[in-house]
Regions:
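Short, acidic/polar
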Residues: 7, 33-41, 104-115, 197-204
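Catalytic beta/alpha-barrel core
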Residues: 1-3, 26, 49-54, 122-131, ...
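Active-site-adjacent beta->alpha loops and helix N-cap segments on the catalytic face
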Residues: 2-14, 32-38, 57-82, 103-106, ...
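Active-site pocket-lining/capping segments in soluble small-molecule metabolic enzymes
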Residues: 69-96, 102, 145-203
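Active-site beta-loop-alpha junctions enriched in small/polar residues
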Residues: 1, 25-31, 54-58, 94-100, ...
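Structural preference for beta-strand elements that scaffold enzyme active sites
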Residues: 21-25, 50-52, 88-94, 122-123, ...
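Conserved, mostly hydrophobic/aromatic
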Residues: 43, 116, 120, 153
Length: 204
């Protein structure tokens, strides 16, 4: 599909144009293993080295995730496919400092993260977060159960306050009260809100 081609070409463009290593997303949603292999072939041919294996969100307009007929159900299955058939890729997976929105509890969510690592994920990228304590606490719990791969913070600077509220509500991330208050102060000045959001996400 166009979106899958876009993922490959965007990551390749970042690598070629900026000299930065990029990670292309490879979701299970709406794809059979055959389609997923075709996408992975394009990524490999484009010179991409890093692939982030995801289950993916429900298609636009739908609220429940359902597997495509004959498709993969879990990101772990996609990780295993890439591990076995595309050894040239470094495989990344998602993790959730504030717990996946559909997880039963934090413990089971973390156990599933370990299953992804055991299946072949060599690094993890977190869901976005705006409270560093969530990240550090998550890393500590992950290390305690034997997850020893790099855990990379997922950073999303706030450039649109309304949009970020929608995104965080969808993924279960929290916006701290102090950050909420600062955004409210700049509600009528989008440029100031963007400047603050970028500074909040990037400064120590």
């Amino acid at each position: 599909s166009g979106r899958r081609t876009w993922a490959a070409t965007s990551a390749a463009g970042i690598k070629a144009g900026l000299g930065l290593e990029a990670t292309a997303h490879s979701p299970c949603v709406t794809a059979t293993p055959e389609k997923r292999r075709a996408t992975l072939d394009r990524m490999r041919d484009a010179g991409i080295s890093n692939v982030r294996a995801l289950r993916g969100d429900p298609p636009q307009g739908e609220t429940e995730w359902t597997a495509t007929d004959g498709g993969l159900r879990y990101s772990r299955e996609l990780i295993e496919l890439i591990r076995d058939e595309y050894p040239e890729f470094a495989i990344g997976a998602a993790c959730f400092p504030e717990v996946h929105i559909h997880a039963t509890d934090a413990e089971s969510d973390l156990r599933y993260t370990k299953e992804k690592v055991d299946a072949g994920a060599g690094f993890l990228i977190t869901q976005l977060f705006y409270d560093n304590r969530c990240y550090y606490e998550f890393v500590g719990r992950a290390r305690e159960i034997g997850i020893d791969v790099p855990i990379i913070p997922g950073i999303m600077p706030i450039t649109n306050a309304g949009q970020i509220r929608k995104i965080t509500s969808m993924c279960g991330s929290d916006i701290p009260e102090r950050l909420q208050a600062e955004l409210e102060l700049r509600a009528d000045d989008p440029a100031a809100a963007t400047d603050f959001g970028v500074a909040y996400a990037t400064l120590p």
